[in-house]
Amino acid sequence: MRDVRIRYDGKVDALYLRLDDSKVVESEALKSGIVLDFNAKKQVVGIEVLDLKRRVPKGDLKQLKVLVA
């Protein structure tokens, strides 16, 4: 099982999930504000969510918990 690193930047309201340490060689916007990062093997290694506060209700953000296995 891989470790997932989660980073939130409040200045730009962006959440980034890093799934793998391999180098990002390509990025693809799925829809407005959602970007996938791929490595050389075309595997998803990162997910960026822009405008997080607009996408997630305020009450849900307060309850956001990260489970560590």
Residue positions per predicted region:
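Short, compositionally biased leader-like segments
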Residues: 1-12
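Small/flexible residues
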Residues: 7-9, 20, 67
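Short, solvent-exposed secondary-structure boundary motifs
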Residues: 1, 24-29, 68-69
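Short connector loops at helix/strand junctions that flank enzyme active sites
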Residues: 12, 31, 59-61
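Metal/cofactor-centered catalytic core regions of large enzymes
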Residues: 1, 22-23, 52-56
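Amphipathic, hydrophobic secondary-structure cores in small proteins
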Residues: 14-48
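C-terminal structural segments of small proteins and small subunits
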Residues: 45-68
